[in-house]
């Protein structure tokens, strides 16, 4: 600093304004001197404060230690001012016995219920639990669990309260089956003996007597694992099971039922959906008889898309030397959760090497990808999902098959493309099936004589065997009751049209089709698919279905509307606009029968022209045999 001032002084001496700069220099030196002195002063004060603080703390620790040491014997050496604390076996020191800060009174943890969409599986379960309680003349208060006591059990994860709730229970009789394929039963509350508990039992059937292990408690029900079956339900047919992972995997919950029983169970699922979410329609008897569920031509080997996945350990853990589990969610066996965790994987994934619901070529692809993953899993920093999508090629009999297959298909250990040849007898063509793993690759499906191209990662129905049945059912129900040629359905609006499946397959029955889809890529594929199939009366629009009818100019009395929304169902604004448009017929296709029931009641009871329509039919279609899933088609017509 002083060298800087000397240089400045030399510079000032050789300038014309010597006096001015000398005065400025002196002022600067004074200012810097004052600042330096103040810094030194506060540094010294800080050191003194620290020394006094640590001396005081050490003094307190020292005397506190002497006091504690006398508590087990004589109190003669305790200072008089502190003697009363020893006599009363209490300490008035602001520090604890160990010299640490006084521990605060622990705060009680409160259970926070998560917000659940009412038509989601968790939301539907609430209705099913209430239905069970009603049938058993029980109130919700009589099955309410003390979740707070479990949350605040500080002894250990296996504390006395947890052990009382999470225990083995023998000879439990299953009373009902849920829409998710789980059994429902009642057991005694182990803590509040005057109460009962509703228990969910995976793979339990009405009439089963089983032994279970409760492992998780919710306010109004508990979850359990099925340990063994003591007495079998008349419905249970274990001889029908083909999946070696049954009872462990969440993929095929109903495999131990006859197919007729599966179809009837799914019909009841649709009935209960309208019972829970359309109670006014039930009370006013506005629902038609529920038709039998339409069977799938294939009950096994039908899925054209599967998505096995895996998890990797957190970064803090050491690198894996063994490949983590690659497969699907496990269900019903707690030891499997432990086994997978022991090798560093995620406790909810079951390692599988085949899927009985997937097509033959997808199982070949799964074998190929598992072998590839065995070599490359160390390159992954986190878990991922592997796409396996079937691709169809219409073969030219005059050319070798391998020359007609896409280069990006899954390959075996020899580097050859894995494929399966099948014959379409109805259309008199031969098809080659390959497995695609790139979500951006364009794949082809062949449905009801039409060819559809779309990105492998985009949505498309996964059971091609039942698709021609569904498209024909929709096509046959487009026409409103005949009231003369002027009232004939001439136009079709396909909301949520995707890549154009229902638009193109229904195009022959009407003069004009308008499809709308929020995805520009899907609309692009829909336009290309219409052109490739020689369909000229289809027009596709990019936009939200909620604003669809702003651009529709076809007369409503001659127009039918197809709805095929995602699982969450339709927006209320869209349903109001649909009612204002007042079409001649509405065909509502849904992969979530619960949101469908909710939407249908809202449309009929809450919208402007809803009362001008009535339900003509409700029918289920079994897109996913051996599972609890069912799709429903509700047809409404203008009166």
Curated annotation (Swiss-Prot):
One GO BP annotation of this record: methylation
Family matches, as PROSITE patterns: SAM_MT_RNA_M5U, SAM_MT_RNA_M5U_2, TRAM, TRMA_1, TRMA_2
Annotated catalytic residues: 591, 631
The entry's keywords: Methyltransferase, Phosphoprotein, S-adenosyl-L-methionine, Transferase, tRNA processing
Region (Disordered): 78-113
Enzyme class: transferase
Catalytic reaction(s) noted: uridine(54) in tRNA + S-adenosyl-L-methionine = 5-methyluridine(54) in tRNA + S-adenosyl-L-homocysteine + H(+)
InterPro entries, per database record: MeTrfase_TrmA_AS, MeTrfase_TrmA_CS, NA-bd_OB-fold, SAM-dependent_MTases_sf, TRAM_dom, tRNA_(uracil-5-)_MeTrfase, U5_MeTrfase_fam
GO MF annotations in UniProt: double-stranded DNA 5'-3' DNA exonuclease activity; single-stranded DNA endodeoxyribonuclease activity; tRNA (uracil(54)-C5)-methyltransferase activity, S-adenosyl methionine-dependent
Listed EC numbers: 2.1.1.35
Residue intervals of the TRAM domain: 163-228
Transmembrane found in the keyword field: no
Effect ascribed to mutating residue 591 to A: Unable to methylate tRNA
Basic residues bias (residue ranges): 101-113
Effect recorded for residue 498 to D: Unable to methylate tRNA
Keyword tRNA processing: yes
Similarity comment: Belongs to the class I-like SAM-binding methyltransferase superfamily. RNA M5U methyltransferase family.
Job description of the protein: Catalyzes the formation of 5-methyl-uridine at position 54 (m5U54) in all tRNA. May also have a role in tRNA stabilization or maturation.
Name the UniProt record assigns to this protein: tRNA (uracil(54)-C(5))-methyltransferase
Organism the protein comes from: Saccharomyces cerevisiae (strain ATCC 204508 / S288c) (Baker's yeast)
